[in-house]
Swiss-Prot record:
Main location: cytoplasm
CDD domains for the chain: SerRS_core
GO terms (BP aspect): selenocysteine biosynthetic process; seryl-tRNA aminoacylation
Similarity field: Belongs to the class-II aminoacyl-tRNA synthetase family. Type-1 seryl-tRNA synthetase subfamily.
Pathway annotation from the record: Aminoacyl-tRNA biosynthesis; selenocysteinyl-tRNA(Sec) biosynthesis; L-seryl-tRNA(Sec) from L-serine and tRNA(Sec): step 1/1
InterPro entries referenced in this protein's UniProt entry, alphabetically: aa-tRNA-synt_IIb (IPR002314), aa-tRNA-synth_II (IPR006195), aa-tRNA-synth_II/BPL/LPL (IPR045864), Ser-tRNA-ligase_type_1 (IPR002317), Ser-tRNA-synth_1_N (IPR015866), SerRS_1_N_sf (IPR042103), SerRS_core (IPR033729), tRNA-bd_arm (IPR010978)
EC number(s) recorded for this UniProt protein: 6.1.1.11
Record-given protein name: Serine--tRNA ligase
Enzyme class: ligase
Length: 436
């Protein structure tokens, strides 16, 4: 979220950043809203100040036995009192209009983010690992899972509809093993603190990380019982990512600089409506309403944020290296960035069944964009004035897509799947998954 004072002082820079995102200029409209807000506040305050002054003048007039003056002032007071509610309402509406407009503005890209329109313009940063070579035509993950009798989309559809899956037996264990492996790696070697957070969150938490108000249509809401729509105060949201709850751990707090960086990780179910994905990845586990993801969140200072971004990317990459999966890293162009991001790296894992790379992790630096919405600050060492923290988030990595990658990269001609060496300690002696 941007400070209107910063926009007023840097209107050309603000508009240039929007244009790089492919968005129209907006500073003039925002400054007009701010002018209206200032005028409404000034008018309301002037009326209140006049009421206060008139009250004192009435006392002085009565003390001087100037009844005519006192009565005139009382009449003026009555008029001011009568218009006061309208002035206060105008002030409230003017403030709300500006706040609403500011809340819907995406973050601006850093200068080194490549310009582009969509994912086709994302430059490749590096390619890592060797793609497996098969003596047979590799299958896609859903054919492998269904062939094993362990991946059941029909049963899931009976329970919940489209874009759900039921994994069973050793395949379910393999998925659980992936999440455990990721948490152990990030907590044991990468310095993250494991968190087991709620997966239901309130409006203010999702506003803080900027899923609300812009991304509401892509989320699932939950009520206690069949609550009527007007009972919005009891509304919860199923988290689309544990970034929401991990980042909000510092909402409305003032940290000491020596506490930073804070690094959190969690492996949770996530829920997305996939509102804009009609017709895409309709079969399989690539794009589901419910999926498991291991999340990485860092809270740090402005000076260390970019270094922390590179570190987070390295931590996410290490998951794929340990699993022996080939991947590439791309930098998202200005037209493909997320709403809250200043800069994003995507890691795309190689899927031989599909014959292409698919996203398995996004690592983003957000600057103070989320911190301003959350009012999350820190006090520099030896300083009196507080500053906004900088926040980062990344997938470390998507567990469901990691399962897809393992199935496709470790498949065998007989339909079985070898378990990656890194996961063997979690599999209870299972080294190969075959049809039972």
């Amino acid at each position: 979220m941007y400070d209107i004072k910063w926009i007023r002082d840097n209107s050309a820079l603000f508009d240039q950043g929007r244009e790089r995102r492919g968005l129209p200029k907006l500073s003039a409209e925002l400054l007009a809203l701010d002018d209206a807000r200032r005028a409404a506040i000034a008018e309301s305050q002037a009326a209140q100040e006049r009421r206060n002054a008139a009250s004192k003048e009435i006392g002085a007039a009565m003390k001087a036995k100037d009844n005519a003056r006192a009565e005139a002032l009382k009449a003026e007071m009555a008029e001011l009192k009568a218009v006061s509610p309208a002035l206060e309402e105008a002030e409230r509406l003017a403030i709300a209009a500006l706040d609403r407009a500011l809340a819907e503005i995406p973050n601006l890209p850093l200068e080194d983010v490549p310009f582009g329109r969509d994912e086709n313009d994302n430059p490749e940063l590096r390619v890592v690992g060797e793609k497996p070579v098969f003596s047979f035509v590799p299958k896609e993950h859903f054919d492998i899972g269904e062939g094993l009798g362990l991946m059941d989309f029909e049963a899931a559809a009976k329970l919940s509809g489209a874009r759900f899956v039921v994994n069973k037996g050793p395949l379910a264990r393999l998925e659980r093993a992936l999440g455990q492996f990721m948490l152990d790696l990030h907590t044991g070697e990468h310095g993250y603190t494991e968190v087991n957070p709620p997966i239901l969150a309130r409006d203010d938490a999702l506003f803080g990380t900027a899923q609300l108000p812009k991304l509401e249509e892509d989320m699932f809401a939950a009520h206690a019982g069949r609550v009527p729509q007007e009972a919005a105060g009891d509304l919860y949201w199923l988290i689309p990512t544990s970034e929401v709850v991990l980042t909000n751990l510092v909402r409305e707090t003032i940290l000491d600089e020596k506490q930073l960086p804070l690094r959190f990780t969690a492996c949770t179910p996530c829920f997305r409506a996939e509102a804009g994905s009609a017709g895409r990845d309709t079969r399989g586990m690539i794009r589901q309403h419910q999926f498991t993801k291991t999340e990485l969140v860092s809270i740090t200072t402005p000076e260390e944020a970019l270094v922390e971004h590179e570190r987070m990317l390295t931590c996410a990459e290490e998951v794929l290296k340990r699993l022996g999966l080939a991947y590439r890293v791309v930098t998202l162009c200005t037209g493909d960035m997320g709403f809250a991001s200043q800069k994003t790296y995507d890691i795309e894992v190689w899927l031989p069944g599909q014959g292409r790379y698919r996203e398995i992790s996004s690592c983003s630096v957000c600057g103070d964009f989320q911190a301003r919405r959350m009012n999350a600050r820190y006090r520099p060492e030896g300083g009196k004035t507080t500053r906004f923290v900088h926040t980062l988030n990344g997938s470390g990595v998507a567990v469901g897509r990691a399962l897809v990658a393992v199935l496709e990269n470790y498949q065998r001609e007989d339909g079985g799947v070898n378990v990656p060496r890194a996961l063997l300690p979690y599999m209870g002696g299972i080294t190969t998954i075959t049809r039972g």
